[in-house]
Amino acid sequence: MNQTVKAKKKKKTITLGVVHIRASFNNTIVTFTDVQGNAISSASAGANGFKGAKKATPYAAQITIDKAAEKAKEYGLKTISIRIGGPGAQRESAMRALFGQNFVVTSILDVSSIAHNGVKAPKRRRV
């Protein structure tokens, strides 16, 4: 019963990465990727225990950024480029949370999609 010992898988060290922040009206999704777009770590407000309307709060976005950044730092990530999109109110607090993580930020890009008279917007809610 000879067992072969496998070598431990070496963790990649990535120094330059991109942070994709999607701030919708209902949730915040954060993904850290390398320059080619391969995901390093990701987190969302729902996955961090926030339910319902609490997922769309700035505090939930801050916690989400902290969790995803913690995982990304294990890969040696130091320099990031930020791509933020979506209409949510969490955008500003997500940015502040990223600046508090001691990353070197090279660029900030707003990638929110803007309709140029495409599909008809959903009707207004009457409360």
Curated annotation (Swiss-Prot):
Part of the 30S ribosomal subunit. Interacts with proteins S7 and S18. Binds to IF-3. Located on the platform of the 30S subunit, it bridges several disparate RNA helices of the 16S rRNA. Forms part of the Shine-Dalgarno cleft in the 70S ribosome. One of its GO terms (molecular function) is structural constituent of ribosome. InterPro entries: Ribosomal_uS11 (IPR001971), Ribosomal_uS11_bac-type (IPR019981), Ribosomal_uS11_CS (IPR018102), Ribosomal_uS11_sf (IPR036967). Belongs to the universal ribosomal protein uS11 family. This is Small ribosomal subunit protein uS11. The keyword Transmembrane does not apply. One of its GO terms (biological process) is translation. Keywords: Ribonucleoprotein, Ribosomal protein, RNA-binding, rRNA-binding. GO terms for cellular component: ribonucleoprotein complex; ribosome. The gene is rpsK. The keyword Transmembrane does not apply. It comes from the Bacteria.
